[in-house]
């Protein structure tokens, strides 16, 4: 018997894989939107409920408009991007690769925007050493759901470059100043972000292979059913697939 594979199904296999990738991208965007809304709510609540801490961080306290004006546009962008993705999925249209790279650039710039706004109103080392730079790792982690090695690496590159440029802009950096204001200190932090992007890319490749195997198995099963009729029992289909493997 000739091997039964998804390759003989051609376009249906490619379409099924594309739809799985789009669904994974949709899950990632939904997670990003939820995280951003949660961060905004927590930040606004902390600003109002912890006035003493707010005043210690910034002269006059952290104004309520700051987190809203910083994170609000990114939340709106993410919701719009998610709606666009859903529309394209409903019309069986792919998400252009250039659009995915641009989307990764915009999303990963949120932590940088927060650091920039905070650093312009408080001590730079506080903004750079606080929680906002850690958000880069969340975006790098979620990039695995893009199922593309280079998109994860791109996310790591954007995070690494933005953090290093912000440190140089806010401090600026030197070679022989205080340790936390030196170029090699902050470049090492950026290097970790870049390596995180590479590791996330390897995980994304592994996840994509699992998706490909699942889609290939489903396509082969459908082909067996089409060849021998709808009344073939699942046990017979499994035996045929095992024989052709």
PLM region descriptions:
Residues 35-140, 159-161:
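Hydrophobic transmembrane alpha-helices and their membrane-interface boundaries in multi-pass
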Residues 1-24:
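Short, Lys/Arg-rich, polar N-terminal cytosolic tail immediately upstream
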Residues 108, 134-141, 190-197, 201:
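Alpha-helical transmembrane segments of multi-pass membrane proteins
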Residues 45-49, 117, 165, 169, ...:
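Hydrophobic membrane-targeting alpha-helices
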Residues 103-125, 143, 149-185:
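Hydrophobic transmembrane alpha-helices
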Residues 197-245:
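Regulatory cytosolic signal-relay segments
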Residues 171-214:
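Alpha-helical transmembrane segments and their immediate juxtamembrane flanks
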Residues 21-37:
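N-terminal membrane topogenic signal
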């Amino acid at each position: 018997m000739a091997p039964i594979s998804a390759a003989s199904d051609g376009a249906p296999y490619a379409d099924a894989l594309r739809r799985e990738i789009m669904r994974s991208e949709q899950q990632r965007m939904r997670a990003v939107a939820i995280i951003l809304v949660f961060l905004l709510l927590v930040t606004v609540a902390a600003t109002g409920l912890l006035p003493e801490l707010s005043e210690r961080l910034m002269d006059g306290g952290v104004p309520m408009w700051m987190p809203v004006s910083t994170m609000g546009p990114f939340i709106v962008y993410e919701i719009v991007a998610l709606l666009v993705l859903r529309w394209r999925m409903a019309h069986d249209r792919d998400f252009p690769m250039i659009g995915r790279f641009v989307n990764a650039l915009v999303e990963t710039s949120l932590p940088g925007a927060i650091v920039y706004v905070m650093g312009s109103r408080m001590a730079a080392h506080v903004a750079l050493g606080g929680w906002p730079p850690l958000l880069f790792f969340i975006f790098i982690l979620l990039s695995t759901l893009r199922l593309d090695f280079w998109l994860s690496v791109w996310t790591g590159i954007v995070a690494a470059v933005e953090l290093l440029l912000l440190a140089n802009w806010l401090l600026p950096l030197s070679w022989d100043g205080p340790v936390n204001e030196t170029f090699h200190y902050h470049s090492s932090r950026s290097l970790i972000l870049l390596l995180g992007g590479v590791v996330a890319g390897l995980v994304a490749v592994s996840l994509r292979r699992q998706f490909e195997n699942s889609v290939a198995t489903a396509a082969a099963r459908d082909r067996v059913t089409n060849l021998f009729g709808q009344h073939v029992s699942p046990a017979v289909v499994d035996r045929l697939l095992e024989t052709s493997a």
